[in-house]
Amino acid sequence: MMLEHVLVLSAYLFSIGIYGLITSRNMVRALMCLELILNAVNMNLVTFSDLFDSRQLKGDIFSIFVIAIAAAEAAIGPAIVSSIYRNRKSTRINQSNLLNK
């Protein structure tokens, strides 16, 4: 695949993720948009690692690290959302201010 195609796809995924993160009012949707952003970053890391330094796997290793962080976020995020839902009876971001009683 050509470099331009991967970069356009990655920019498209990143833009969708940023737009969804800014406009979403639901916590689950915000977590999904955050995953889109992380996947776009991983695509760029692997692409540029292959393009500039194909013998050393620094970009690939760093993308595996980002995938591990995303897996931890995917495990902890829904647990936090369900805990907030149990206490506040809502998953809307603007209604879940935990600093107020």
From Swiss-Prot:
It holds the Pfam family Oxidored_q2. InterPro entries: NADH_UbQ_OxRdtase_chain4L/K, NUOK/Mnh_C1-like. It catalyses: a plastoquinone + NADH + (n+1) H(+)(in) = a plastoquinol + NAD(+) + n H(+)(out); a plastoquinone + NADPH + (n+1) H(+)(in) = a plastoquinol + NADP(+) + n H(+)(out). GO terms for molecular function: oxidoreductase activity, acting on NAD(P)H, quinone or similar compound as acceptor; quinone binding. GO terms for biological process: ATP synthesis coupled electron transport; photosynthesis, light reaction. It comes from the Eukaryota. Keywords: Chloroplast, Membrane, NAD, NADP, Plastid, Plastoquinone, Quinone, Thylakoid, Translocase, Transmembrane, Transmembrane helix, Transport. The chain crosses the membrane at residues 2-22, 32-52, 61-81. Its EC number is 7.1.1.-. It is a multi-pass membrane protein. One of its GO terms (cellular component) is chloroplast thylakoid membrane. It is found in: Plastid, Chloroplast thylakoid membrane. HAMAP family: NDH1_NuoK. NDH is composed of at least 16 different subunits, 5 of which are encoded in the nucleus. NDH shuttles electrons from NAD(P)H:plastoquinone, via FMN and iron-sulfur (Fe-S) centers, to quinones in the photosynthetic chain and possibly in a chloroplast respiratory chain. The immediate electron acceptor for the enzyme in this species is believed to be plastoquinone. Couples the redox reaction to proton translocation, and thus conserves the redox energy in a proton gradient. Belongs to the complex I subunit 4L family. This is NAD(P)H-quinone oxidoreductase subunit 4L, chloroplastic. It comes from Nymphaea alba. The gene is ndhE.
